[in-house]
């Protein structure tokens, strides 16, 4: 046993205490995952040393046979998971076992609901890793020595998974890490070596690093005929096959194997929604195995967090979260890419601008989009589940990926005036199929909420004529539509921007009536312009309104209302926008206004402008003045 120095006691970071408490209680029904997590971590440590040794073979010393070993001591009620991988320094131990260094940790804890079933899935996505040891152990001891620091001593870390841990320098002869679990009274099942072998076969079969368990010696004996049978010495026996699942033929892999592999690679307790396994040969040769999760990863909206798939080169693990292999708008995709062409000593910098990387990224992106297109066609209910979970991320696609813009647009879903309710289920193809004869544009509106969009006065003429309008109300929607201006040769047109041109949907009689109304109202328009002054860009007769007295419209050359609000929320400077004020001459309120004296008319005009601004923006710069004017007019009514 290693000789320990003076033990120092330290308190866990607050988040670690929370995670330990939640995990021990939420994951209790799935206790066996502790071995999956610890063996996976040990395999990663061996993989990391193998990668480092590509540029410095001396790191192996006299021990280049990388492995993970799992052993049981029934007398002391312990399980030990050992590796001869990269190991840890004292600082590594403090940072990795005493704190949670992940950014977005506070947001993660904020998502927890108190529902054990839901929280267990979320905790699994967060990555329980090492701390899963405390599901089955009431004390954990870690002994480790770094392979990267020749002068480093060993380190021992010890904790009972409560408020604190102890740490000390020790003498440890060999590099790598030993994790000793002192099992709880109710964890006897894990003292059964056959039980542990079964768990390793279930979760770790694909690992390229051998996972070994001790095979007891067989003493010399005699057979039934009295012949001598030689004994066999005890030895470390490899339990997993070591054949990476993705290297096997698809026809030889069961759905159950794909699902179990997903749980390992994604650290998720749920099964995946769907997956795609592809071997690409030709100029660039690689294999990818890509999964779409059922649930959003907890850190989906944390842009500081690296996202991406795992990268292997010729079955050798290179890195996690290789974001260069998958566009940001597909950051929910889990899985791996295994290249036959990249060098083993590849770095993130080399990946950044590399034609092999680009080919793998483009190929993997198309596979994911094809997978989603097929799901949308074959199973609308499952696709709706995907869209409700990941739709807002996919909406980033048209801005990021010009090449696949049309493919992404086919996958988008929207709420619409065609349906009741805010469910986003209408595709652009659905819309085009329902377009009226002579209609050449796809009409949409962006607002703060579904209700604000559905009840916006600018929809009145569309409702009257039975023209469908897409209703957009997510924060990202204005950004999306600024990059998605056309689909299948149909222009996308906001109903609250610029001149409204319904083309052939306006018959000659409608156009003649509009021109006649504009001419008859010309003097009154001048009166409105004088009353409102520089508060508006222009006043004109509307061809959008049938029930409302007025509305405001953004000029084609100005920033839209929703884009301005988006930039303001991000702390960006936004130029002041003056709106076009459209008036409905037929409305009784407008007719009544025209009989008022100029001072009163001015008050009414400003109230109408404020009302129209509220309907479009949802807020006013000076609500107090609006209330004062309205009170005054009501008193004089």
Swiss-Prot record:
Main location: cytoplasm
GO cellular component, one term: cytoplasm
Subcellular location: Cytoplasm
Keyword Cytoplasm: yes
Region listing for A, in residue ranges: 1-348
Region annotation (B) ranges: 349-565
Cystine connections: none
Record keywords, A-Z: ATP-binding, Chaperone, Cytoplasm, Nucleotide-binding, Stress response
GO molecular function: ATP binding; ATP hydrolysis activity; ATP-dependent protein folding chaperone; unfolded protein binding
Region (C): 566-637
Superkingdom as given in the UniProt entry: Bacteria
One Pfam match: HATPase_c_3
Coiled coil: none
Family note: Belongs to the heat shock protein 90 family.
Assembly notes: Homodimer.
Primary role: Molecular chaperone. Has ATPase activity.
Protein name, UniProt field: Chaperone protein HtpG
Protein species of origin: Idiomarina loihiensis (strain ATCC BAA-735 / DSM 15497 / L2-TR)
The organism's taxonomic lineage, starting at the top: Bacteria, Pseudomonadati, Pseudomonadota, Gammaproteobacteria, Alteromonadales
Name of the gene encoding the protein in the UniProt record: htpG
